Amino acid sequence: MPIAAESLRLGPWRDGVNYSVPAEDLSPSGIHDMQNCTVGLAGEVSKRKGFVKFNSSAMNSGATVTALGQVTLAGAEKVFAFCGNKFFDVTGGSATDRTGSTTITAGNDYTWQWVLAGDTLVAVNGQDTDAIKWTGGSNNAAALDDDSRFTKPNHIAFWENRLWVGNTNTVPDRVWRSDAGDIETWGALNYHAFGYDVTGLSPFQSTLSVHTEQGIHTLTPTGNSTIPFSQQQRTQRGTIAGRTIVTIPGERQLFVREDGIYQWTGGPAVEKISFALDDGYWPNLNSARLPYSFALFYPAEEQVWFFLPFGASQTQMNSVVIYSNRLNCWFGPYNGFTRNAAAMIDELPHAGDFAGHIQKHETGNNDDGSAIKAFFETASLAPLGDAVQCRWLYNRTLFDNTGDFDLSVTQTSASIVSNVETIQMGDLGATLNTTFTLDASVL
């Protein structure tokens, strides 16, 4: 018989997740809680994709991956990784040791930042005396010639045809620049001092942005050979984690601070954009480990993945919250794994783990063979308003059958007994030529 009822539609969920507002106060397009789910362009929510090993055999006896990436060197596309005290060419998923005579100190926190400087890969980690360079092919890595101007730089950039490094072990507030067109020639006075420890470098618009925790400074070309760059402080806040600086379409620079995630568009102020993560998510992070967090821009989806330490005593990055530039909303976290570095390889997110592997994300429906536990919780709106208490609710849920799993739909509300309905999705591979199970197999 027909059901006499008022209709209350929840979704599409284009507002993403908001951990700072009670479920009762969210709009129908908001999400109260979620795990391992993604929000699509139509506002649909789906379980995230999984990951598989990029290199089947662990590098360096299962040491921690401290950097990875994909670059074109000598006309060939190369995948590389720093793992423990070694540097590897991992092109094609097979690791070849290219450490040579370079010194690489192993340690989970000795992560590398790298740039492609013309036809040379250059990387720094703030721990080893020299920056490391690699020209690809069958060559080994080697120490960068820096004319003995600095040691142990933490941050690096390539801009205006020059190599830039910042926060060296003796003068942490200084940024050095190479000669134009020559990354291994460094003048004795070719540096800029900023008064505070440099926390990150990133080209932005027509400038080089230099981050300190106390502000963002810019270096701008002057066209004058005597003073080739003018220096100016633009904001009163900068990042605490250099590996989280990401520039996205629309000329917006995103980065992490202790209280949240901010954006800078080039003006005199920065803006916090992660209010939706306050209260229910951000306070659970280990703030002491945020300087070791990192971020990755996923161009195909226009997403920024922030790898963060969830848990008061958590030291490794075990939680990924995602900002959608297209929807201007947040979703996540993704969890169930730990990562130490990330990069785009073959247009997909890849991340290094603590066991010598690069993991290829956004692939398959499981995590290297393990099931993904995912859920999301909608807003909790009163169907007839706050003044009316309903005794019965009729729930209709729409979903797509895309795999072999069970779908559970749970309803909870005040004064109404909670109910869980489990729908057995069955195996999409079931056909007339295989075993058919009533109420489970798909026709």
Language-model segment annotations:
Residues M1-T99, T103-V122, Q236-R252, R257-L443:
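Beta-sheet repeat architectures centered on beta-propellers
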Residues A58-V65, T102-A106, S138-K152, Y191-F194, ...:
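Surface-exposed ligand/attachment interfaces on beta-rich extracellular proteins
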Residues T91-S94, T135-S138, A180-D182, P221-N224, ...:
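Short loop/turn segments that connect beta-strands within beta-propeller blades
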Residues T111-D146:
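Hydrophobic or amphipathic alpha-helical targeting/insertion segments
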Residues T151-D179:
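Carboxylate/His-rich catalytic cores and anion/metal-binding grooves
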Residues T170, H211, S313-M317:
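Short, solvent-exposed loop/turn segments at conserved positions within beta-propeller repeat blades
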Residues D179-Y191:
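A short, charged helix-loop
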Residues L208-R234:
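Surface-exposed extracellular loop regions of Gram-negative outer-membrane beta-barrel proteins
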